[in-house]
């Protein structure tokens, strides 16, 4: 896109605002590189990229990118044998730290809401390298200022020697400065440092009293800084140790630089990705300041910008306008007062196109739609503040000639006051001829004009729409409101009347312009009112459609969650049913064992194969198929009482005990009796029964799965509870309900304490609202 267009539309100011939102030089470099793309896939990708980060930015607290800096020059120097210092190593460490923190934040965000997907950001996170070892090496070796003493054994030993030697020097010099005989000879009773040597400040006249080396003197020459001979050798030792320390520091830094060099490619990837993240977050921050929204890009020639406003104008006073090229409209001509905001409308459209194709969210309501243009051409100048002259006309015409040479069907052209600066009749004719030419090129065009001849231009040409900016005759000022589809009308009579011009003069003037023009003005006024009403209705309709779509999406999500929950409940119910059958099978094994003992010891006439056959009948009740895997049921004859059936929803076999009407049946599945829909039953072939000799066992009394203790005294209730639990265990109940009511809570407390101690109770809990709430305790039996 032409740089001249970007300059006229002030895109650099937009980039400046985005750059202000970045944290690092990496992000600012990305902003400076930002420019409108023209490839459809590229533009759409950039917009989706920004939208993803904006969604995250608006919903979450992002980790800080503070300290993120460019490291590629350091990595390059490390790769060619240079040695990095501590500060430079810390810049690399901070890059790794920032990328790790952001990746951790991203993973935690996904765990909180697994259904939300950010495919573009996810891909960036997958590209971030693992640099844990490098971070650990740097972090354990140095801080922001220097190498740690423990960076190596040698360094620790050297620094320890330096510390001990310094301490001896200090002690020696402290004795000298604290000696009473030396007090008057010293400028100050302190130990100081000159040329990296420990010295004392001696008055010049007492130089001969101190044997040592003079390292410096004061500006006045009255103080000499002397290193006493008693510490010279110790200071020499420190100098040697300092040299040893420097050598060891260089060795350690060289080693760390080697680690950096080994991860050079990974560090460059991390720098690139985190620079992009900084850039995208800056876009998101700027989007929030202008309440930016994501447009939908269309392959066809479409522009629809609901309530668009210029992002560089004051948000509190700027007027938002809906700009659109509807149906087959290719040219929009805006007429109206010179100060009515026509130029702002042109710049708003052009700048929004440039922003969108640069991957920036745009200042409109939701629902905007845009084509992607190869080029946006502008002929916009401040025609209102300079005198119209030949030179002005020539300047504009030169620009227009360049535009017409390059424009094509993939161009958007913005003409401000087309044909102005010359004779009105010639200017209007030129304007119409130029519009005809660009229409033949296939370009989309928006042009402003104050020539009345262009109002009629759209009526005898297809694909051309009039528009105007509204003027308030009450306040005698423009409202800056754009009216699409409505040509501008003259307000001279209304303004004159408002200013007090005689009605006789106004009426006489009206007779001079003819009835047709008066009717046209009246028609335009009516169109203005209708246009405003339709515009408001359109915006409201768009809002309702968006809300309906959001509701639809939310309900679809809830429905899917419900289906998953329902399937989970069914599988859980199947598992519980199988557990009950398994428990019954275990009990049957115990019974068979008792029967065998009876047979063996008392000679009961029961044959082994008969016992096994009965056991198998109970085993046949148990299936492990998932609810999701049940097959389509086979229909045999009509189901009758006594038939053996398979319950499809549970995957269990049972016997029909009773038919309830034509649609339901009572079925016994092992120890479970349930009322089920007949359509959920599949008739199975009944096995032939062999005559068997029966060993009878006394039936236990049938009890309910609930015990109502309301009205009982405390001791009576606990006795009743003990008896009930024993019977429930014998009946192989896995879960029972103890109804104690709410009352004062004493009985509830007593029941629960008793359940806690009872040997047959595995655990207990308070009742759910559907089970009776606090008035019920649910006990699970062993």
From Swiss-Prot:
Enzyme Commission code: 3.1.-.-, 3.6.4.-
UniProt keyword annotations, A-Z: ATP-binding, DNA-binding, Endonuclease, Hydrolase, Nuclease, Nucleotide-binding, RNA-binding, rRNA-binding
A single MF term (Gene Ontology): rRNA binding
Listed SMART domains: MUTSac, MUTSd, SMR
Main enzyme class: hydrolase
PROSITE patterns associated with the record: DNA_MISMATCH_REPAIR_2, SMR
Superkingdom field: Bacteria
Any one GO BP annotation for this protein: rescue of stalled ribosome
Binding site for ATP: 336-343
Residue stretches making up the Smr domain: 707-782
Keyword Manganese: no
Subunit composition and interactions: Homodimer. Binds to stalled ribosomes, contacting rRNA.
UniProt similarity note: Belongs to the DNA mismatch repair MutS family. MutS2 subfamily.
Function: Endonuclease that is involved in the suppression of homologous recombination and thus may have a key role in the control of bacterial genetic diversity.
Protein name, UniProt field: Endonuclease MutS2
Source organism of this protein record: Staphylococcus epidermidis (strain ATCC 35984 / DSM 28319 / BCRC 17069 / CCUG 31568 / BM 3577 / RP62A)
